[in-house]
UniProtKB/Swiss-Prot annotation:
It is a peripheral membrane protein. It comes from Danio rerio. This is AP-2 complex subunit mu-B. Residues 170-435 form the MHD domain. One of its GO terms (molecular function) is lipid binding. Adaptor protein complex 2 (AP-2) is a heterotetramer composed of two large adaptins (alpha-type subunit and beta-type subunit), a medium adaptin (mu-type subunit) and a small adaptin (sigma-type subunit). It is found in: Cell membrane; Membrane, Coated pit.
Amino acid sequence: MIGGLFIYNHKGEVLISRVYRDDIGRNAVDAFRVNVIHARQQVRSPVTNIARTSFFHVKRSNIWLAAVTKQNVNAAMVFEFLYKMCDVMTAYFGKISEENIKNNFVLIYELLDEILDFGYPQNSETGALKTFITQQGIKSQHLTKEEQSQITSQVTGQIGWRREGIKYRRNELFLDVLESVNLLMSPQGQVLSAHVSGRVVMKSYLSGMPECKFGMNDKIVIDKQGKGGTTDDTGKSGKQSIAIDDCTFHQCVRLSKFDSERSISFIPPDGEYELMRYRTTKDIILPFRVIPLVREVGRTKLEVKVVIKSNFKPSLLAQKIEVRIPTPLNTSGVQVICMKGKAKYKASENAIVWKIKRMVGMKESQISAEIELLPTNDKKKWARPPISMNFEVPFAPSGLKVRYLKVFEPKLNYSDHDVIKWVRYIGRSGIYETRC
């Protein structure tokens, strides 16, 4: 159970305060401000224990959300509530900022009254909350008895994430497979660590209470132990199987069918939601290979050559490519020659930034630079920070594929063929580094 919830600004001033237990006093507010927000050293742990009181906290921009308790609670449950609270506030009034919180403080208190009951999370589904809590306040005073009973059955029923009676002139379903690939590679091209974090995000604008079925690769292996590490950089993203280390689903998914059929069956919420989140470390398709060559010419000059190779199908096009090549602190000047794109030395960042708008698969490009160094008495050698890379590719580096996406709605008499469906793959770089 949660004893209290506090929302602070970057100065440590309390914007929202709700206490659910008598054992949480004003001293808890001050303790968090002094020991976390105003701490001399940055607090890295998301859980802070002060005088037998536990503070679970997350930060959004310059806003802190802290759940406080003196009990031995389930930490995962508390963080799930905090992240859900952030999602709900974003859905209601956009960006979480001090100004937006002050302008919507009445709304936030109304939401807390519905989401938390005596410190226990109850209902955090945005779709259900929006049926009776609006930007203008609670709607229940103007609802008929039939509408009130409909809300009650939605919140307390088996399908609390979707209300009945939804109608659209055109039934549409959008599915995005969003992945972030992280890599650390040695100068010789050996993969030291690699993993992909992925999300399946859907936007459903469907009438009635449809049943959706979503199928992925023919074989999906859930490896709870996560012993992965091998990678595949052949550039072929047509894998028939995928090994997932761990995954979580939206509450609408029927897990029994996923275990037996490896298909996801669900009644979707209305609007945008995250259907699935997963992580994999096996058989990753590395979109780019970075080949660095650094040569020291005496003590006042460096010659750097970097080649990037795209390891995916020639029919695909990568975008927003950026390579950051670090330079020593005593750099006095840089001369750059690049075959493609634009490159510029940024002295304030101690790096050469090379940008390429687009690049097709199975191609390579290179950049050469001569770096002039100022004489220095420092005998310590340059540490050679890794070369980092940013990009966006139109495929899933994990190899995840959507085999089918079907919709059934027997009551309203529309079939799968009447639904307009869109599937999109977006792979982005996370921390994508190559040592030099």
